[in-house]
Curated annotation (Swiss-Prot):
SUPFAM superfamilies: EF-G C-terminal domain-like, P-loop containing nucleoside triphosphate hydrolases, Translation proteins. GO terms for biological process: positive regulation of translation. GO terms for cellular component: plasma membrane. Residues 11-193 form the tr-type G domain. It is found in: Cell membrane. PROSITE patterns: G_TR_1 (PS00301), G_TR_2 (PS51722). This is Elongation factor 4. Belongs to the TRAFAC class translation factor GTPase superfamily. Classic translation factor GTPase family. LepA subfamily. Its EC number is 3.6.5.n1. NCBIfam families: lepA, small_GTP. InterPro entries: EF-4 (IPR006297), EFG_II (IPR041095), EFG_III/V (IPR035647), EFG_V-like (IPR000640), EFTu-like_2 (IPR004161), G_TR_CS (IPR031157), LepA_C_sf (IPR038363), LepA_CTD (IPR013842). GO terms for molecular function: GTP binding; GTPase activity; ribosome binding; translation elongation factor activity. It comes from Streptococcus equi subsp. equi (strain 4047).
Length: 610
């Protein structure tokens, strides 16, 4: 194709993504669009087609973004090329959403006709507005008995400030309104800007590892074009590779002769090492490089940290390889090696949130068959030392000596909770119990309220979400963003077994809750740790001060069984001998800590605050 034909083709390209709160019907709508444009034959069609990970299908959530090319013949008789970039809706995967949106010019905003606007709908709309996208509202599930499209239309105008007069009324399940959505995309979403005659600039928005072809890049071409045989260069590190194949996804990968401005597809270039590519980097041609890289993504900082250790220590290298491969596909995962006296060699991993941590753990266990032990999650604290230094500490075992600590600051989040009016009291009580500070409260309509609190992130990473769902019967929706660091009265609590610290059980706690938390965990460990041949004291300590203690009684053999009657001094001698043996055992014996003990530190959080 000459450059004139390519420019003509570019005018008929539409790049869009679908954004929505969890469960508002985003993946079903994507399925219907694929059917309507006959991208997928009815034989291959299955529910949630784009959610290719088993985990996504089981949980019914979208975790990874997906990019697909569709062909659509519009009512005006022209053929259009659509690129649908599917995005996750969950708050932990906002980073995936922001990456998808950077590759689009438009966004289809799906709102449930019965539930209306939810917290993550808002969060994703703001991301779309930041990227200057054209937003097309769609009111979905209009065939539900509880649907109230007019109220939702009003909400979209009042809460988001979008003109919803032309919002499409649709039902993705029944296939109503799908054609209207496609026509609106043709009319309202702008064609990609960019110039095919300029040097190549392509944004990497994802990458996957293929055992045969190495790293495969998923890119959005912003300027120029790329074809097999070209030599590409990464702008962040200057490394060059020869392109072996370019193509598109329909969800299956299909090779093409070229990718030009506006296209979304993949590049395979025999990239062998995972570290050579980074999501957000710009690809250009080595022969005619672009002057500057594209404006990439802001680097996401992990907010929740946990130790991951293989149960079998010889699997350490397998775990490292598995984490490297996951990191390639999930740019927000960070990890570094660490050792623990209790658990051996492992990694300290950073995650965006608890669901992210959960998903990574499941993917490691499923896709790579590695059995893991996870330690309790913690957040990044700022510890101010008396000599004026400030340390960032994410691992409780790295906390400095309490006598050298001047003050400790912890991250607070701005939590936005949307909830029906009848549950406002329960939500406020929960937030108060989690050390939250009330900020403001707005009424969205007669029945729904948007409550904003500042809450310490450490309280949220435990089980805030579960508690919120149970106290509002599942009606609350929740979104959070990091607000600031604040000074808090925090202490590090150590757990001692038989007088020895178990570093993996240490945790940071607010001074006001230290005694209850210590007492609770000691009692819990007493039930979990099996009885030994000798007595085992379990202690909770802050520095040198023991705040709680419980003893696991020793198992003992009845040494008097063979004394029928007989002299009391004989019996006493046998008992004294047994006692001396137990004492010697206690001095040298070590206690095995079962996996449940580490998990119990997680699950006990709220029992102490009831």
């Amino acid at each position: 194709m000459n450059s004139q034909e390519l420019k003509k083709r570019q005018e008929n390209i539409r790049n869009f993504s679908i954004i929505a709160h969890i469960d508002h019907g985003k993946s079903t709508l994507a399925d219907r669009i694929l059917e309507k444009t006959e991208t997928v034959s009815s034989r291959e069609m299955q529910a949630q087609l784009l959610d290719s990970m088993d985990l996504e299908r089981e949980r019914g959530i979208t975790i990874k973004l997906n990019a697909i090319e569709l062909n659509y013949k519009a009512k005006n008789g022209q053929d259009y090329i659509f690129h649908l970039i599917d995005t996750p809706g969950h708050v932990d995967f906002t980073y995936e959403v922001s990456r998808s949106l950077a590759a689009c010019e438009g966004a289809v905003l799906v709102v449930d006709a019965a539930q209306g606007i939810e917290a993550q709908t808002l969060a994703n709309v703001y991301l779309a507005l930041d990227n200057d996208l054209e937003i097309l509202p769609v009111i979905n599930k209009i065939d539900l008995p509880a649907a109230d499209p007019e109220r939702v239309r009003q909400e979209i105008e009042d809460v988001i400030g979008l003109d919803a007069s032309e919002a499409v009324l649709a039902s993705a399940k029944s296939g109503i309104g799908i054609e209207d959505i496609l026509e609106q995309i043709v009319e309202k979403v702008p064609a990609p800007s960019g110039d095919v005659d300029q040097p190549l600039q392509a944004l990497i928005f994802d990458s996957v590892y293929d055992a045969y072809r190495g790293v495969i890049l998923q890119v959005r071409v912003v300027n120029g074009m790329v074809k097999p045989g070209d030599t590409i260069q990464m702008m962040s590190n200057g490394k060059t590779f020869d392109v072996t194949e370019v193509g598109i996804f329909t969800p299956k990968a299909i090779g093409r002769d070229f990718l030009a401005t506006g296209d979304v597809g993949y590049i395979a270039a025999s990239i062998k090492t995972v570290a050579d590519t980074r999501v957000g980097d710009t690809v250009t041609l080595a022969t005619n490089p672009a002057a500057e890289p594209l404006h990439g993504y802001k680097q996401m900082n992990p907010m929740v940290f946990a130790g991951i250790y293989p149960i079998e220590s010889n699997k350490y290298n397998d775990l490292r390889e598995a984490l490297e491969k996951l990191q390639l596909n999930d740019a927000s995962l960070q990890f570094e090696p660490e050792t623990s006296q209790a658990l051996g060699f492992g990694f300290r991993c950073g995650f965006l949130g608890l669901l992210h941590m959960d998903v990574i753990q499941e993917r490691l266990e499923r896709e790579f068959n590695i059995d893991l032990i996870m330690t309790a999650p913690s957040v990044v604290y700022h510890v101010n030392i008396t000599d004026g230094d400030m340390l960032e500490v994410s691992n409780p075992s790295e906390f400095p000596d309490p006598t050298k600590v001047d003050s400790i600051e912890e991250p607070y989040v701005k939590a936005q909770i949307m909830v029906p009016q009848e549950f406002v009291g329960a939500v406020m009580e929960l937030a108060q119990r989690k050390r939250g500070d009330f900020v403001t409260m707005d009424y969205i309509d007669d029945n729904r309220v948007n409550v904003i609190y500042h809450i310490p992130l450490a309280e949220i990473v435990f089980d805030f979400f579960d508690k919120l769902k149970s106290s509002t019967r599942g009606y609350a929706s929740f979104d959070y963003e990091i607000a600031e660091y604040r000074r808090s009265q925090l202490v590090k609590m150590d757990i001692l077994l038989n007088g020895d610290k178990v570093d993996a059980l240490s945790f940071i706690v607010h001074r006001a809750f230290a005694y209850e938390r210590g007492k609770l965990i000691v009692e819990k460990l007493k039930k979990i740790i099996p009885r030994q041949q000798f007595e085992v004291p379990i202690q909770a300590a802050i520095g040198q001060k023991i705040v709680a203690r419980s003893d696991i009684k020793a198992l003992r053999k009845n040494v008097l069984a063979k004394c029928y009657g007989g002299d009391v001094s004989r019996k006493r001698k046998l008992l004294e001998k047994q006692k001396a043996g137990k004492k010697r055992m206690k001095a040298i014996g070590s206690v095995e800590v079962p996996q449940e003990a580490f998990l119990s530190v997680l699950s006990m959080d709220d029992e102490s605050k009831k």
